[in-house]
């Protein structure tokens, strides 16, 4: 930008617009040249320095245009700009330094300067302060952080010295206090992101393991040791050469991501949002292949970089702390280990002296002492250096395998596995685990990387083992004590997704890996078969519960036959609960808990009674009626009343609901006469948001659609709907719902009152609400798929609908069914991230299955309603 027009003599304020008009395209062209060099692979360190240099020249020329040479003011770059780094859309932070008299005298000139820079297109963030004001402002460590990296743009030696003196440690923030403040800031920032970088849309600047972590280490080093980069600490013995090299390499990786993100977003975006991930991956050269999408490769690279940065920065933070506090007297633990200021440390400086078995001894000591704060930085570094010598399990000797299994059988096995994963040991011991470390799946269903999901599953298993009830898992704490060998469940959890990303069925491929691992670690044939079977079938219970009708005895019989034994059922149930709950914080809810518990109890009963002769339908009806009768009698109802209510309920009702649900429905019917409408709602689980809505009404056109639309408008998501024909031309509708929007208050009485009011009016006036599709869902659109099959022995038609999920989807589907004059008998709603997979059993208005022409008309109507194109 040597040809900037600002170098001409100042023609006065009137010429500022012309100057800005000429300078603006020069800045744009400079950025375009940098973008081209970025695409050619030039190091980011050089690109951000070149951009800062270009802006430097423009800033100086604008300053000379607006500010008199004898003003007594000086101009300084601060923050990232002060470091000499400017990303494409970053703010340009500057400080104008001068005494208060000079500030006041040139106030209009400064306003002109900043306006001119904005007109050019620079996002200026400025402060005007005297040295004393800098000292006062630096009481806020975030201000000090910006100032300690200041760089003079237009300033003489006196101005530079005045600023340095104003923020020197004798004035503000002694090094130790600054270190503590920045460490607390770092920890608080990590907490804002859930203490993990493994989010679907991570923040590459401020998130854990991001660029801000590296900058924080640099600020600490600058304040404490007076060095401008971490590499300078190598000579001082505070940072290892390998650590400095690794941090420099990962900084380049993250900086390239950030530079590219600013380009594709055309704004100062720091989050890798779905809006930009694919475009950025393509720009960075990550191509799709049969096993992985390019965007998945890019994200895996990021997650691995963030994990390594966190690992090394943890060590450096501890070393910086030791510089201020000194080393405490070691507290011997035995076995060659001690506690140093609460950290576990190897006694020998040369640990582990070539003995890789010491790695397992280290984790055994860690597990044995709950008071340990973490791993001592020197021992952590020694561990990192010895990792390359740790053999994978398949080539390790029997003693090493025994040591690993001893850790797995220990009382704190899940904590140990988490630590081993975080420090890279687990991936070294099981190379397949290293392959999925940092691996994301480009969808909204899996909100964690594969390795983090696996660790979440293991943590959930640890909750089952805690021996106390958890309201999220109603029966898991009862099933857990039945496990013969809990470590087998941990192994199944460890291997269940380990084959993700290889192509093919990950359950089958993972089962092969699990078998090989079990055999290598000398598990018995029975234990090996159990772990292998669990990995291969780990999705079966979830799919059965969510996609099939578990009130159907044939479904239960098929599932129980597949499971075969009570032991397998116990293990599979716990693995399924842990897996679903570890997939997404929002995925597990009271309805899924109840659904899996119902399937568990139904399968357990089938196994107990024998699979050869399942109980006939009449016997099941009789048992359900008697169980419900017993509950109603306990509530004070006589047999005459009970029989009268049972007579008004469809037989199928007794096969689909639990006895306590039947008793609630029957007791509710006492309040209503034939031909009247009843709406009841209750909490399905005490102290939980899950609601059960029961509607008894004369059959009316549009009833189902009106109920669904009302529930949707009130912010409730429907998880299951049962629609049964009752005597006297009435219908039984039972909806299982959860608050889905913030405006759904979760009050069952208010919801029931709203539904009563709607059903008392004209149902044809009730229309689905129109709502915008959330930003994240817009990036996962696909054409809906509609399939038909027969159900109920050919008396009904089953629709299987797979479509992009969005607010109000079910209400729109119900409206289409109503406009096609179709009757809904059953609805099963399942959402998997961005995919809605719903099933309906329907008939035409004459209660007949759909003809081929009716099917085609319905398919066309649904696709027209749901197709995103």
From Swiss-Prot:
Assigned EC number: 2.7.7.59, 3.1.4.-
Catalyzed reactions per annotation: [protein-PII]-L-tyrosine + UTP = [protein-PII]-uridylyl-L-tyrosine + diphosphate; [protein-PII]-uridylyl-L-tyrosine + H2O = [protein-PII]-L-tyrosine + UMP + H(+)
GO biological process, alphabetically ordered: regulation of nitrogen utilization
All residue ranges annotated as the HD domain in the record: 450-572
Pfam short name (any one): HD
Family: Belongs to the GlnD family.
Function summary: Modifies, by uridylylation and deuridylylation, the PII regulatory proteins (GlnB and homologs), in response to the nitrogen status of the cell that GlnD senses through the glutamine level. Under low glutamine levels, catalyzes the conversion of the PII proteins and UTP to PII-UMP and PPi, while under higher glutamine levels, GlnD hydrolyzes PII-UMP to PII and UMP (deuridylylation). Thus, controls uridylylation state and activity of the PII proteins, and plays an important role in the regulation of nitrogen assimilation and metabolism.
Stated name of the protein: Bifunctional uridylyltransferase/uridylyl-removing enzyme
Organism, as annotated: Xanthomonas euvesicatoria pv. vesicatoria (strain 85-10) (Xanthomonas campestris pv. vesicatoria)
């Amino acid at each position: 930008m040597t040809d900037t027009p600002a170098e001409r003599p100042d023609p006065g304020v009137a010429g500022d617009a012309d100057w800005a008009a000429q300078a603006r395209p020069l800045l744009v062209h400079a950025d375009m040249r940098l973008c081209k060099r970025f695409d050619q692979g030039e190091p980011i360190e050089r690109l951000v320095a070149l951009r800062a240099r270009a802006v430097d020249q423009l800033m100086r020329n604008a300053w000379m245009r607006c500010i008199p040479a004898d003003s007594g003011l000086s101009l300084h770059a601060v923050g990232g700009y002060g470091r000499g780094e400017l990303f494409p859309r970053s703010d340009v932070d500057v400080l104008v330094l001068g005494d208060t008299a000079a500030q006041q005298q040139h106030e209009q000139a400064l306003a002109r300067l900043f306006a001119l820079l904005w007109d050019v297109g620079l996002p200026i963030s400025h402060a005007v302060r005297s040295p004393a004001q800098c000292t006062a402002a630096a009481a806020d460590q975030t201000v000090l952080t910006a100032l300690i990296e200041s760089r003079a743009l237009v300033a003489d030696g006196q101005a530079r010295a005045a600023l340095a003196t104003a923020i020197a440690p004798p004035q503000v923030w002694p090094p130790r206090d600054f270190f503590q403040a920045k460490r607390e800031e770092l920890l608080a920032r990590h907490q804002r992101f859930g203490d993990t970088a493994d989010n679907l849309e991570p923040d590459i600047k401020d998130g854990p393991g991001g660029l801000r972590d590296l900058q924080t280490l640099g600020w600490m080093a600058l304040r404490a040791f007076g060095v401008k980069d971490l590499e300078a600490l190598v000579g001082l013995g505070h940072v290892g050469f390998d650590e400095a090299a690794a941090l420099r390499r990962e900084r380049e990786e993250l900086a390239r991501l950030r530079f590219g993100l600013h380009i594709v977003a055309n704004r100062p975006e720091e989050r890798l949002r779905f809006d930009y991930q694919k475009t950025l991956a393509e720009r960075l050269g990550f191509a799709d292949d049969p096993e992985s999408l390019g965007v998945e490769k890019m994200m895996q690279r990021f997650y691995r970089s963030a994990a390594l940065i966190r690992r090394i920065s943890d060590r450096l933070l501890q070393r910086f702390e030791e510089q201020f506090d000194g080393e405490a007297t070691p507290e011997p633990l035995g076995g060659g280990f001690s506690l140093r200021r609460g950290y576990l440390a190897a006694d020998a400086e040369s640990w582990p002296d070539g003995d890789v078995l010491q790695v397992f001894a280290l984790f055994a000591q860690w597990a044995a002492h709950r008071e340990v704060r973490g791993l001592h930085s020197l021992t952590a570094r020694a561990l990192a250096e010895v990792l390359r010598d740790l053999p994978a399990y398949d080539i390790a000797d029997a003693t090493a395998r025994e040591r690993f299994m001893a850790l797995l059988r220990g009382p704190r096995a899940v904590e140990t596995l988490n630590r081993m994963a975080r420090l890279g040991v687990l991936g070294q011991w099981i190379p397949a685990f290293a392959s999925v470390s940092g691996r994301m799946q480009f969808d909204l269903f899996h909100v964690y990387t594969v390795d983090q999901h696996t660790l979440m599953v293991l943590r959930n298993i640890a909750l089952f083992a805690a021996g106390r009830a958890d309201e999220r898992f109603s029966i898991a704490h009862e099933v857990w004590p039945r496990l013969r060998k809990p470590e087998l469940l941990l192994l199944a959890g460890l291997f269940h997704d380990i084959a993700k990303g290889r192509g093919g069925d990950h359950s089958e491929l993972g089962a092969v890996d699990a078998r090989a691992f079990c055999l290598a670690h000398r598990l018995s044939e029975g234990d090996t078969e159990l772990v292998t079977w669990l990995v291969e079938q780990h999705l079966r219970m979830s799919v059965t519960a969510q996609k099939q009708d578990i009130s159907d005895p044939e479904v239960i019989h098929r599932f129980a036959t597949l499971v075969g034994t009570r032991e397998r059922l116990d293990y599979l149930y716990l693995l399924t609960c842990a897996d679903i709950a570890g997939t997404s914080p929002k995925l597990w809810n009271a309805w899924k808990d109840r659904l899996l518990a119902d399937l568990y109890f139904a399968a357990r009963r089938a196994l107990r009674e024998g699979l050869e002769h399942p109980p006939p339908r009449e016997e099941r009806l009789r048992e359900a009626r008697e169980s419900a009768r017993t509950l109603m009698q306990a509530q004070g109802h006589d047999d005459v009343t009970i029989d009268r209510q049972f007579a008004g309920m469809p037989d199928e009702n007794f096969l689909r609901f639990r006895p306590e649900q039947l008793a609630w429905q029957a007791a509710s019917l006492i309040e209503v006469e034939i031909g009247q409408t009843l709406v009841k709602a209750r909490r399905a689980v005490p102290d939980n948001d899950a609601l059960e809505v029961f509607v008894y009404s004369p059959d009316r056109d549009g009833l189902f659609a009106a109920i669904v639309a009302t529930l949707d408008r009130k912010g409730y998501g429907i998880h299951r709907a049962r629609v049964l024909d009752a005597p006297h031309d009435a219908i039984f509708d039972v909806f299982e719902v959860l608050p889905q929007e913030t405006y759904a208050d979760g009050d069952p009485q208010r919801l029931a009152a709203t539904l009563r009011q709607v059903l008392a009016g004209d149902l044809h006036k009730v229309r689905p609400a129109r709502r915008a599709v959330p930003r994240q869902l817009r990036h996962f659109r696909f054409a809906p798929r509609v399939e038909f099959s027969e159900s109920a022995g050919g008396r009904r038609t089953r629709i299987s609908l797979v479509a992009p999920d969005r607010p109000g989807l079910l209400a729109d589907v119900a409206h289409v069914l109503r406009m096609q004059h179709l009757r809904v008998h059953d609805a099963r709603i399942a959402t998997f991230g961005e995919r809605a997979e719903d099933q309906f059993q329907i008939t035409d208005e004459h209660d007949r299955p759909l003809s081929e022409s009716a099917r085609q008309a319905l398919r066309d109507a649904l696709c027209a309603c749901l197709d995103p194109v």
